[in-house]
Curated annotation (Swiss-Prot):
Its main location: cytoplasm. Gene3D superfamilies: NAD(P)-binding Rossmann-like Domain. The gene is ghrB. It comes from Escherichia coli (strain ATCC 8739 / DSM 1576 / NBRC 3972 / NCIMB 8545 / WDCM 00012 / Crooks). This is Glyoxylate/hydroxypyruvate reductase B. The active site is at R237, E266, H285.
């Protein structure tokens, strides 16, 4: 008899078929308490869980006594109670490598669109404001040869540094938990403390996961240390930034502009002051949102769940020690 798994995110037909070759698959719309209650027997028997954008906490795990592995279609896993999973010896799988290049593309797009005011001036053209040769009120700022500060030199940070160094001749500063020898050798990147990075960078790109340590890591104090001409980019996790402090910094002119793919609350409220600022490019968490990459992430997540329930945790496992 095939193991039972719960799928709470739609998959392309071929990937669903692959999952069904290995498991009895039960599809649900979400992991809300109502859904769990209505499908209590299915949740009680499930050995695997696959999906994204839902919280997996201790309360849910209490309803799933046979769960052995959960696989998220994402690199981030801050919506999972890792301690609760680990305590129950439940494997957590994620997709850390598939989306690296695509997210780095998104970061570079935010750098370019904020610096050159692409969204703002495009809207002005559509509004009929381009009636003569443009003047300084349409100008942006250069990207090439400007200093890029990267906070979080992981896979995505490295991919961004590659684009910035080779494509735009940008000096690279970085701050991370440890020195990154490859970044320093390949991109001539310079490690520095966070204060130095904030003070010297023309673009500050935040690429950090959300943890207890990183929550509101960026607040009023950090924005006050940045150049008034600096542009802030966030494509990590929204709550790493105190959004009210960011809004205040933009309103006071402490920083020049912001390009944001993530927010403290998602979807972003239509009442957010960020949406009324011409110098803010706000996009709806599109970091990995291309057809190719989202398919690759889903395929990786399917393979991860198959591997996990077969006891293979050599890659893409957050807590492999629980399999010992």
């Amino acid at each position: 008899m095939k193991p039972s798994v719960i799928l709470y995110k739609a998959l392309p037909d071929d990937l669903l078929q692959r999952l069904q070759e290995h498991f009895t698959v039960h599809q649900v719309a979400n992991l809300s308490p109502q859904t769990v209650e209505q499908n209590a027997a299915i949740f009680a028997e499930a050995e695997g869980l696959l999906g994204s954008n839902e919280n997996v906490d201790a309360a849910l795990l209490e309803k799933m006594p046979k769960l052995r592995a959960t696989s998220t279609i994402s690199v981030g896993y801050d919506n999972f109670d890792v301690d609760a999973l680990t305590a129950r010896k439940i494997l957590l799988m994620h997709t850390p490598t598939v989306l690296t290049e695509t997210v780095a593309d998104t970061l570079m797009a935010l750098v370019l669109s904020t610096a050159r005011r692409v969204v703002e001036v495009a809207e002005r053209v559509k509004a009929g404001e381009w009636t003569a040769s443009i003047g300084p009120d349409w100008y942006g700022t250069d990207v090439h040869h400007k200093t890029l500060g990267i906070v979080g030199m992981g896979r995505i940070g490295m991919a961004l540094a590659q684009r910035a160094h080779f494509g735009f001749n940008m000096p690279i500063l970085y701050n991370a938990r440890r020195h990154h020898k490859e970044a320093e050798e390949r991109f001539n990147a310079r490690y520095c403390d966070l204060d130095t990075l904030l003070q010297e960078s023309d673009f500050v790109c935040l690429i950090l996961p959300l943890t207890d340590e990183t929550h509101h890591l960026f607040g009023a104090e950090q924005f006050a240390k940045m150049k008034s001409s600096a542009i802030f980019i966030n494509a990590g996790r929204g709550p790493v930034v105190d959004e009210n402090a960011l809004i205040a910094a933009l309103q006071k002119g402490e920083i020049h502009a912001a390009g944001l793919d993530v927010f403290e609350q998602e979807p972003l409220s239509v009442d957010s002051p960020l949406l009324s600022m011409a110098n803010v490019v706000a996009v709806p968490h599109i970091g990995s949102a291309t057809y190719e990459t989202r398919y690759g992430m889903a395929a990786c997540a399917v393979d991860n769940l198959i591997d996990a329930l077969q006891g293979k945790v050599e890659k893409n496992c957050v807590n492999p020690h629980v399999a010992d």
